[in-house]
Amino acid sequence: MKSLTLLTICAVLSVSLSMNDLALDVVLDPAPDPATEPAPAADSSASSSASSSSSSASDSSASASDSSDSDSSSASSSSSSSESASAEVTTEDPAAATEPEVVIMKRDLASVLLRRKRAAGQAAAAFTLTQVESLSEVCELNLACEHMAETAGIVAAYTAYYGPPPF
Protein backbone atom coordinates (compact mmCIF):
# COMPACT_ATOMS: atom_id res chain seq x y z
CA MET A 1 0.00 0.00 0.00
CA LYS A 2 2.88 2.33 0.81
CA SER A 3 4.55 1.64 -2.52
CA LEU A 4 1.30 2.36 -4.37
CA THR A 5 0.97 5.65 -2.51
CA LEU A 6 4.59 6.51 -3.24
CA LEU A 7 4.15 5.71 -6.94
CA THR A 8 0.99 7.83 -7.08
CA ILE A 9 2.73 10.78 -5.47
CA CYS A 10 5.68 10.44 -7.86
CA ALA A 11 3.31 10.32 -10.83
CA VAL A 12 1.47 13.44 -9.67
CA LEU A 13 4.75 15.28 -9.15
CA SER A 14 6.00 14.18 -12.55
CA VAL A 15 2.86 15.41 -14.27
CA SER A 16 2.90 18.69 -12.39
CA LEU A 17 6.54 19.30 -13.30
CA SER A 18 5.91 18.52 -16.94
CA MET A 19 2.85 20.77 -16.97
CA ASN A 20 4.85 23.51 -15.29
CA ASP A 21 7.36 23.45 -18.18
CA LEU A 22 4.55 23.78 -20.70
CA ALA A 23 2.86 26.54 -18.73
CA LEU A 24 6.02 28.63 -18.70
CA ASP A 25 6.16 28.61 -22.50
CA VAL A 26 2.55 29.73 -22.73
CA VAL A 27 2.73 32.30 -19.93
CA LEU A 28 5.80 33.99 -21.41
CA ASP A 29 3.90 34.81 -24.62
CA PRO A 30 2.28 38.23 -24.25
CA ALA A 31 -1.49 38.34 -24.66
CA PRO A 32 -2.27 40.20 -27.91
CA ASP A 33 -4.40 43.31 -27.78
CA PRO A 34 -7.57 42.98 -29.92
CA ALA A 35 -7.06 46.55 -31.21
CA THR A 36 -3.63 45.72 -32.66
CA GLU A 37 -4.63 42.52 -34.50
CA PRO A 38 -3.68 42.32 -38.20
CA ALA A 39 -6.03 42.51 -41.17
CA PRO A 40 -8.85 39.91 -41.53
CA ALA A 41 -7.05 38.19 -44.44
CA ALA A 42 -4.16 37.16 -42.19
CA ASP A 43 -6.60 36.06 -39.47
CA SER A 44 -8.55 33.79 -41.78
CA SER A 45 -5.46 31.95 -42.99
CA ALA A 46 -4.08 31.49 -39.49
CA SER A 47 -7.42 30.40 -38.03
CA SER A 48 -8.09 27.92 -40.82
CA SER A 49 -4.69 26.31 -40.34
CA ALA A 50 -5.17 26.19 -36.58
CA SER A 51 -8.64 24.66 -36.76
CA SER A 52 -7.97 22.09 -39.49
CA SER A 53 -6.68 19.39 -37.13
CA SER A 54 -5.22 18.95 -33.67
CA SER A 55 -1.77 18.26 -35.05
CA SER A 56 -1.71 21.48 -37.03
CA ALA A 57 -2.93 23.35 -33.96
CA SER A 58 -0.04 21.99 -31.94
CA ASP A 59 2.35 22.84 -34.78
CA SER A 60 1.01 26.37 -34.97
CA SER A 61 1.34 26.79 -31.21
CA ALA A 62 4.95 25.65 -31.41
CA SER A 63 5.62 28.04 -34.26
CA ALA A 64 3.80 30.77 -32.37
CA SER A 65 6.08 30.40 -29.37
CA ASP A 66 9.15 30.35 -31.65
CA SER A 67 8.11 33.32 -33.74
CA SER A 68 6.92 35.52 -30.89
CA ASP A 69 10.49 36.73 -30.41
CA SER A 70 10.96 37.51 -34.10
CA ASP A 71 9.56 40.38 -36.15
CA SER A 72 6.91 38.32 -37.96
CA SER A 73 4.22 38.32 -35.29
CA SER A 74 1.27 38.86 -37.61
CA ALA A 75 0.66 35.18 -38.31
CA SER A 76 1.42 34.03 -34.80
CA SER A 77 -0.70 36.57 -32.93
CA SER A 78 -4.02 35.00 -33.83
CA SER A 79 -2.89 31.46 -33.12
CA SER A 80 -1.19 32.45 -29.87
CA SER A 81 -4.31 34.29 -28.74
CA SER A 82 -6.39 31.15 -29.05
CA GLU A 83 -3.61 29.13 -27.45
CA SER A 84 -3.20 31.51 -24.51
CA ALA A 85 -6.95 31.63 -23.93
CA SER A 86 -7.11 27.86 -23.65
CA ALA A 87 -4.00 27.79 -21.50
CA GLU A 88 -5.49 30.26 -19.03
CA VAL A 89 -8.53 28.06 -18.55
CA THR A 90 -6.69 24.76 -18.15
CA THR A 91 -3.29 25.42 -16.59
CA GLU A 92 -2.97 28.79 -14.96
CA ASP A 93 -0.91 27.41 -12.06
CA PRO A 94 -0.25 23.66 -12.29
CA ALA A 95 1.21 23.42 -8.79
CA ALA A 96 -1.98 24.85 -7.30
CA ALA A 97 -4.11 22.56 -9.46
CA THR A 98 -2.39 19.36 -8.26
CA GLU A 99 -2.32 20.23 -4.56
CA PRO A 100 -6.12 19.98 -4.12
CA GLU A 101 -6.09 16.65 -5.98
CA VAL A 102 -3.53 15.29 -3.52
CA VAL A 103 -5.55 16.60 -0.60
CA ILE A 104 -8.72 15.07 -2.02
CA MET A 105 -6.94 11.76 -2.61
CA LYS A 106 -5.67 11.75 0.98
CA ARG A 107 -9.12 12.66 2.27
CA ASP A 108 -10.73 9.87 0.23
CA LEU A 109 -8.15 7.37 1.44
CA ALA A 110 -8.69 8.42 5.04
CA SER A 111 -12.46 8.08 4.72
CA VAL A 112 -12.13 4.61 3.15
CA LEU A 113 -9.80 3.47 5.93
CA LEU A 114 -12.11 4.89 8.58
CA ARG A 115 -15.12 3.14 7.05
CA ARG A 116 -13.22 -0.17 6.97
CA LYS A 117 -12.18 0.24 10.58
CA ARG A 118 -15.72 1.05 11.67
CA ALA A 119 -17.15 -1.84 9.66
CA ALA A 120 -14.61 -4.25 11.16
CA GLY A 121 -15.33 -2.86 14.62
CA GLN A 122 -19.09 -3.37 14.24
CA ALA A 123 -18.65 -6.91 12.93
CA ALA A 124 -16.25 -7.76 15.74
CA ALA A 125 -18.63 -6.29 18.29
CA ALA A 126 -21.27 -8.82 17.24
CA PHE A 127 -19.03 -11.67 18.48
CA THR A 128 -18.01 -12.49 22.00
CA LEU A 129 -14.39 -12.33 23.05
CA THR A 130 -14.15 -16.14 22.99
CA GLN A 131 -15.50 -16.29 19.43
CA VAL A 132 -13.05 -13.64 18.21
CA GLU A 133 -10.19 -15.52 19.90
CA SER A 134 -11.31 -18.71 18.16
CA LEU A 135 -11.29 -16.95 14.79
CA SER A 136 -7.81 -15.57 15.41
CA GLU A 137 -6.47 -19.03 16.38
CA VAL A 138 -7.75 -20.46 13.10
CA CYS A 139 -6.36 -17.51 11.18
CA GLU A 140 -2.90 -17.84 12.81
CA LEU A 141 -2.27 -21.02 10.82
CA ASN A 142 -2.25 -19.07 7.54
CA LEU A 143 0.38 -16.31 7.35
CA ALA A 144 -1.57 -14.31 4.76
CA CYS A 145 -4.72 -14.50 6.87
CA GLU A 146 -2.76 -13.44 9.95
CA HIS A 147 -1.29 -10.46 8.10
CA MET A 148 -4.74 -9.47 6.83
CA ALA A 149 -6.10 -9.80 10.37
CA GLU A 150 -3.54 -7.25 11.53
CA THR A 151 -4.49 -4.75 8.83
CA ALA A 152 -8.17 -5.32 8.05
CA GLY A 153 -9.43 -7.03 11.19
CA ILE A 154 -9.89 -10.63 12.25
CA VAL A 155 -13.47 -11.03 11.05
CA ALA A 156 -12.67 -9.70 7.57
CA ALA A 157 -9.58 -11.90 7.33
CA TYR A 158 -11.42 -15.03 8.46
CA THR A 159 -14.28 -14.31 6.06
CA ALA A 160 -11.88 -13.75 3.15
CA TYR A 161 -9.93 -16.99 3.69
CA TYR A 162 -12.42 -19.39 5.26
CA GLY A 163 -15.88 -18.01 4.53
CA PRO A 164 -18.42 -16.65 7.01
CA PRO A 165 -17.83 -17.50 10.68
CA PRO A 166 -19.76 -20.59 11.80
CA PHE A 167 -21.36 -18.85 14.78
UniProtKB/Swiss-Prot annotation:
<keyword id="KW-0091">Biomineralization</keyword>
<keyword id="KW-0301">Gamma-carboxyglutamic acid</keyword>
<feature type="domain" description="Gla">
    <location>
        <begin position="131"/>
        <end position="163"/>
    </location>
</feature>
<dbReference type="GO" id="GO:0060348">
    <property type="term" value="P:bone development"/>
</dbReference>
<dbReference type="GO" id="GO:0001649">
    <property type="term" value="P:osteoblast differentiation"/>
</dbReference>
<protein>
    <recommendedName>
        <fullName>Osteocalcin 2a</fullName>
    </recommendedName>
</protein>
<feature type="propeptide">
    <location>
        <begin position="19"/>
        <end position="118"/>
    </location>
</feature>
<comment type="similarity">
    <text>Belongs to the osteocalcin/matrix Gla protein family.</text>
</comment>
<dbReference type="InterPro" id="IPR000294">
    <property type="entry name" value="GLA_domain"/>
</dbReference>
<dbReference type="GO" id="GO:0005576">
    <property type="term" value="C:extracellular region"/>
</dbReference>
<keyword id="KW-0732">Signal</keyword>
<feature type="binding site">
    <location>
        <position position="133"/>
    </location>
    <ligand>
        <name>Ca(2+) 3</name>
    </ligand>
</feature>
<keyword id="KW-0106">Calcium</keyword>
<feature type="modified residue" description="4-carboxyglutamate">
    <location>
        <position position="133"/>
    </location>
</feature>
<feature type="disulfide bond">
    <location>
        <begin position="139"/>
        <end position="145"/>
    </location>
</feature>
<dbReference type="GO" id="GO:0046848">
    <property type="term" value="F:hydroxyapatite binding"/>
</dbReference>
<feature type="binding site">
    <location>
        <position position="137"/>
    </location>
    <ligand>
        <name>Ca(2+) 2</name>
    </ligand>
</feature>
<keyword id="KW-1015">Disulfide bond</keyword>
<feature type="binding site">
    <location>
        <position position="140"/>
    </location>
    <ligand>
        <name>Ca(2+) 2</name>
    </ligand>
</feature>
<keyword id="KW-0479">Metal-binding</keyword>
<comment type="function">
    <text>Binds strongly to apatite and calcium.</text>
</comment>
<feature type="modified residue" description="4-carboxyglutamate">
    <location>
        <position position="140"/>
    </location>
</feature>
<dbReference type="GO" id="GO:0005509">
    <property type="term" value="F:calcium ion binding"/>
</dbReference>
<feature type="compositionally biased region" description="Low complexity">
    <location>
        <begin position="38"/>
        <end position="87"/>
    </location>
</feature>
<keyword id="KW-0964">Secreted</keyword>
<dbReference type="GO" id="GO:1900076">
    <property type="term" value="P:regulation of cellular response to insulin stimulus"/>
</dbReference>
<dbReference type="InterPro" id="IPR035972">
    <property type="entry name" value="GLA-like_dom_SF"/>
</dbReference>
<feature type="region of interest" description="Disordered">
    <location>
        <begin position="28"/>
        <end position="99"/>
    </location>
</feature>
<dbReference type="GO" id="GO:0031214">
    <property type="term" value="P:biomineral tissue development"/>
</dbReference>
<dbReference type="GO" id="GO:0032571">
    <property type="term" value="P:response to vitamin K"/>
</dbReference>
<feature type="binding site">
    <location>
        <position position="140"/>
    </location>
    <ligand>
        <name>Ca(2+) 1</name>
    </ligand>
</feature>
<feature type="modified residue" description="4-carboxyglutamate">
    <location>
        <position position="137"/>
    </location>
</feature>
<dbReference type="GO" id="GO:0008147">
    <property type="term" value="F:structural constituent of bone"/>
</dbReference>
<feature type="signal peptide">
    <location>
        <begin position="1"/>
        <end position="18"/>
    </location>
</feature>
<dbReference type="InterPro" id="IPR039176">
    <property type="entry name" value="Osteocalcin"/>
</dbReference>
